Amino acid sequence: MSKMAIDIASSCSNRFLEGYTAILPPEQEDKLREIVGDWEKIMRPRVEQPDELLELARNDSVALLIVGDPMQATTHIDLEARCNELDINFNIVPGITATSLAVSLSGLQSYRFGRQVTIPYSYGSYLPTSPLEMIYKNYENNLHSLILFDLDPTGMGIENPRPMAPSNAISLLEKMEGKLVEKGENISCKVSDFEGILLTDISLDTQKIRSGKMSEISKLNDGRIHCLVIAAKMNQNEAEAFERRKIV
């Protein structure tokens, strides 16, 4: 947190930690309490149906604490709109987001990234292929893909998040590949042959950054929270950075 964020959160009479679009490790939650004071964790329903928060904010100061970039989620943009409608003062304090850290720590050049992709948990027999289709589109345009892993197997945003493991994410990509092949789609590269960089527990003491083929990365399930970069054709500097991060 920036000094501004700490000062503002500490000064608010009411503090809520939003616990479903991103998460803090338990030890970081304890540290947050030490830094800004006590807070209450709230999940998706209370943020998407924010009448309680809005009523509180009419007459008192409220801090909604969000891990990373506070305005990356549509829910938070909608909350700003609701405050504007009700003439409730709304201020944004920028945070450091894992998505920007992932790009810089990957060793790949930021201007060569295409559209960001999220791999969702499959719900029953439903498995969309659009995430892999976007990865292929980026790849065919020689653009790298930053891939975020789902946190919520239920899709409801009510229970404590359960971060997706690399093996699960890559297995889902391979199932998407199978569905595309069944439909007769031409694929530019097998999922197992993609080269990528797994970023684990970014900014924590346990941070690890490792590169290799998807078949290698799928075996890396240590750590807690992961994201993945699938690389397109790399230039010399990128290729050297990739080699320095190789799985050993």
Enumerate the predicted regions with their spans.
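Fold-independent oxyanion-binding glycine-rich loops
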Residues: 18-20, 42-44, 67-69, 96, ...
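Conserved active-site and cofactor/substrate-binding residues in soluble primary-metabolism enzymes
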Residues: 4, 27, 44, 48, ...
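Beta-strand/loop-alpha-helix module characteristic of Rossmann-like adenine-cofactor folds
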Residues: 90, 100-248
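Aromatic-residue detector
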Residues: 11, 16-26, 38, 76, ...
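Class I S-adenosyl-L-methionine
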Residues: 1-89, 93
